[in-house]
Amino acid sequence: MKYSIIVPVFNRPDEVDELLECLTHQSEKDFEVVIVEDGSQTPCEEVCKRYEHMMDIHYYYKENSGPGQSRNYGAERAKGEYLLILDSDVVLPEGYLKAVSDELSREPADAFGGPDKAHSSFTDTQKAISYSMTSFFTTGGIRGGKKKMDKFYPRSFNMGIRRDVYLRLNGFSNMRFGEDIDFSIRIFKAGCRCRLFPEAWVWHKRRTDFRKFWRQVYNSGIARINLYKKYPESLKLVHLLPMVFTMGVIGTLLLLFFGFLPYMLGTVHVFPTLGNAMAALGCIGLAGIILYTIALFIDSSRENHSVKIGLLSIRAAFTQLMGYGCGFLSAWWKRCVLGQSEFSAYNKTFYK
């Protein structure tokens, strides 16, 4: 068997149904599906049973241990030459498996990954979040874009790897967030050939509201410091940009407030030079933020053919950059300054 598609799932039977439905339309048929139920209260076993006559599908239920360990559980039971790791909230185009096969035939790889896109049926908020998570303006192209500021690391929403390599590297670590980047780093360190398959893309639903999106990106910022503590060389300039943006926005607001406060209080004559300098610097920072916002709006509106999504993309981008930046700064203080151990946030409310 060529492919084993491994999907960890937690309380997402509807998403699993949609994913399995799209798998019935794949032109390539040499695959099995391994669904690992990670302690769900709303299981998808009945959904899986409906597809047993359409594909080779295996359903396993286990106690909750997180997505990384659930993928390992599935990999230990998989039979395919290649393991395809997917999130439950992705949908595959009909030619997905063929695109993977074509790339492997053209240039073999030990591990690989593909980009993600927003489906036309997604909500405007999902499309805005998808834009923010894939745009060069917000990610530096490190998530599979054509322009990039760092090499491509496969992500667990759309990732493939030879089964023998997966087992040799012991799969995913027990990190709660950032476990896919941790695995990709170890893949590179082992000297494996790792590639981006640009045509093996998926539709990725992502978070459905900005509150959940904040929790996700806040933990991503924490995970980057956790990864830095394990692999200091993995921290690149592009990973610092959200933190710089966050501090820049906060700094601009403070400069504007304290720069114009003397004018509002009628005390500008006390420290005129300092007040004017702070106000001027604040205005320069504000101008930069406005220009960046306009660029986001124009680019997203053009890409999504929607002014509304363009406006929502501004909120999504600021949520992503400042959420990541705040998580990054929090983890830097706790781990690098205070010397605390690895941690994550919103553990009890992450999915709510």
Predicted regions and their residues:
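A conserved acidic beta->alpha catalytic loop
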Residues: C22, E37-E46, N64-S65, D87-P93
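Short aromatic/hydrophobic "clamp" motif used to bind/position activated sugar donors
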Residues: L83
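Conserved donor NDP-sugar-binding/catalytic core segment of glycosyltransferases
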Residues: E94-K127, K205
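Catalytic donor/gating beta->alpha subdomain of glycosyltransferases that bind UDP-sugars
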Residues: S173-L235
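Membrane-embedded multi-pass helical conduit in multi-pass membrane proteins
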Residues: F245-V337
